[in-house]
Amino acid sequence: VLDYLSDINAQPDYCIGVSAGACNGVSFVSGQRGRNKRINIEYAGDKRYVSMRNLFRQKSMFGMDFIFNDIPDKLDPFDYEAFAASPIAFVTGVSDVETGKPVYFSKEAIQHDSTVLRASSSIPVFSPIVSFRGGKYLDGGTTDPIPVRKAMTDGCDKVIVVLTRDRNYVKSPEKMRSIYRRMLK
């Protein structure tokens, strides 16, 4: 969807994302058409990307160092300069472990590294808590999975929502909520 928006030169004023949406959004804002598809296809079967081995070695099923350091810095470089120069405002949502509320960071938080993206993509229980700018954060999707209200609060009057699930999907109540709470204490 984001590549199509690039193809038709649809350039929004504002882009917000949490978790995988934030990771995909930064490539869109930086103008790196095809980058998300390349990464997802090329590394989907790579044990460094996702594996049970990672869970035991790095305390995350996802190879967070591989995803947020090796890929953007070496294997399929992220264009930090183009991202910073883009006129599109970008916001990443994370979940504050201490308050249980969403916290949002502007594109300036992604100037030279992807720590805030890592935090926004760190799934509770399956990934370690990420410390960033004095806070402790996990996956932004746990507190604000579709941040339309934040976009409206920030002044957007028209919103395009790109979902990873069918629009009729309704999330079932969290079965592991009590386990999450105990593990995050």
Task: Go through each PLM region and give its residues.
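Patatin-like phospholipase
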Residues: 1-18, 26-185
